[in-house]
Amino acid sequence: LKVPDLPLPEXYXXALN
């Protein structure tokens, strides 16, 4: 999944990544 260019916490990104 691609995360939008928003100031999201690393945990969020990481989880999706």
Curated annotation (Swiss-Prot):
Subcellular location field: Secreted
Entry keyword annotation includes Transmembrane: no
Predominant location category: secreted
Superkingdom of origin: Eukaryota
Tissues of expression: Expressed by the venom gland.
The keyword Secreted is assigned to this record: yes
Keywords: Neurotoxin, Secreted, Toxin
GO cellular component, as recorded: extracellular region
An MF annotation (GO) of this entry: toxin activity
Family listed: Belongs to the scolopendra toxin 8 family.
Protein name: Scolopendra 7913.19 Da toxin
Organism whose genome encodes this protein: Scolopendra angulata
Lineage: Eukaryota, Metazoa, Ecdysozoa, Arthropoda, Myriapoda
